[in-house]
Amino acid sequence: MKHKVKHIHFVGIGGSGMSGIAEVMLNLGYKISGSDIHDSVTTRRLKKLGATVYIGHARTHVESADAVVTSTAILPDNPEVLAARESKVPVVPRAIMLAELLRLRQGIAIAGTHGKTTTTSLITSVLAEAGMDPTFVIGGRLEAAGSHAKLGRGEFIVVEADESDASFLHLQPVLAVVTNIDADHMDTYEHDFGKLKQAFVDFVQHLPFYGMAVLCVDDAHVLEIMPAITKPVTTYGLSETAQVRAADIRHSEGQMHFTALIGVNGKTRKLKIVLNLPGLHNVQNALAAIAVCNEVGLPDVSIVRALADFKGVDRRFQRYGEIPLTDPETGRNGSFTLIDDYGHHPVEMAATIAAARGAFPGRRLVLAFQPHRYTRTRDLFEDFVKVLSTADVLLLTEVYSAGEAPIIAADSKSLARSLRVLGKVEPIFVERVDELEEAIHSIARDKDVVLVMGAGSVGGVAPTLSRDSQVEARLLVSPKENREPAVLLLQGS
């Protein structure tokens, strides 16, 4: 019956989860159309690949569609969704479409509150290095591939498993990774952490009898669910109890060096690893990839090469290079290194700040942060205050609502007041995101680290800052001048 579906329409096609599935379906030969409220790099890429993309939503966009795909970000009263239902065109949740893709290959699904995108990308990179040509659907753009997704010819498909709306329960992979479990998206689970943990148990229990769960034993909540899991398990982490663990860990020039100890059948195999990412959290992500690829049976040389050559993921500690600081009025000069990151949960932010401190020791850390969602700010308010107070300088802009209504005392000004009471850092409130670039230039000094974090519109700050600085440099900076680099870090989960 599947042959009757030829044209698939994606409502919100520019989203990170939707665009990847759309690209794979396009590569499979389906006619793909979609709509989004904004033009973007992603929508333009899909157009070049042959998709029809509309900016804005209208009933006419779905007139010839055989199926319409939506995500939980799309409201039920969306005109395209309403038109599809009235015409009896199937409206398919994104997760179910992803589950259909998993049926075509052997699925490797990565779940967890933090680290999904990087871990998925690392596993994909090792499979590719080993010549396995995997299909992948990732929440961020894999720099080596220049895309969120790719249809490979190999037997494996590697995907992120999204717990935010419990949609990962539709997936039935043969290998399931759980990186960690933390309090986030709690509205989905009726603010019951027990229900969130049970969802992860149910996700793992969907494995076939010949499948394997790969679990991080560094995480207390993962340890708590392990007794309820009846499927085969491989453990990884920094803990000495892990079957795949790391020893002799050290930072060096933005990379992590360690020895991977792989326990198999009572014997331990050692791999010398250079990971082209900073931070202990990325060592954990790499260990997950090593555990999965060891289970698949990939050669050690592919693991070592892929981790050393890893090009990174869009907005995950993404480095934009040296940004000049030139101000003719004050005579200020020098430069900083610009890094963009997607982190927006306090745990992720703490890990990335620690990675920045480790990669660039002794430098002043300027944090520019846009909170994401009023509900998250409310639920994790004290955790945000704690992690934001670890910056040396803090630029704080208003919450990115993601469609939510404002919540009293869950906005950025409330965060700023609490931070002032704590007294560890004096927050500088920047009303609008488009004013952050000027604020950064006014506050940054030579050899600073400026970390800008957030999952919302703050994602446009780093590329704009980099582009504008390059233009300025051509106009104002003599190529003969010798300036030492500093560090600017933009972070967002």
Swiss-Prot record:
GO biological process, one term: peptidoglycan biosynthetic process
One Gene Ontology CC term in the entry: cytoplasm
Compartments where found: Cytoplasm
Pfam entry (one): Mur_ligase_C
Gene Ontology MF terms: ATP binding; UDP-N-acetylmuramate-L-alanine ligase activity
Gene3D superfamilies: Mur ligase, C-terminal domain, Mur-like, catalytic domain, NAD(P)-binding Rossmann-like Domain
Metabolic or biological pathway: Cell wall biogenesis; peptidoglycan biosynthesis
SUPFAM superfamilies from the UniProt entry: MurCD N-terminal domain, MurD-like peptide ligases, catalytic domain, MurD-like peptide ligases, peptide-binding domain
EC identifiers of the protein: 6.3.2.8
Catalysed reaction equations from the record: UDP-N-acetyl-alpha-D-muramate + L-alanine + ATP = UDP-N-acetyl-alpha-D-muramoyl-L-alanine + ADP + phosphate + H(+)
Keyword vocabulary terms for this entry: ATP-binding, Cell cycle, Cell division, Cell shape, Cell wall biogenesis/degradation, Cytoplasm, Ligase, Nucleotide-binding, Peptidoglycan synthesis
Domain of life from the UniProt record: Bacteria
Residues that, per the record, bind ATP: 112-118
EC main group: ligase
InterPro entries (UniProt xref): Mur-like_cat_sf, Mur_ligase_C, Mur_ligase_C_dom_sf, Mur_ligase_cen, Mur_ligase_N, MurCDEF_pg_biosynth, UDP-N-AcMur_Ala_ligase_MurC
NCBIfam families: murC
Function: Cell wall formation.
Family: Belongs to the MurCDEF family.
Protein name (Swiss-Prot/TrEMBL): UDP-N-acetylmuramate--L-alanine ligase
Organism from which the protein derives: Nitrosospira multiformis (strain ATCC 25196 / NCIMB 11849 / C 71)
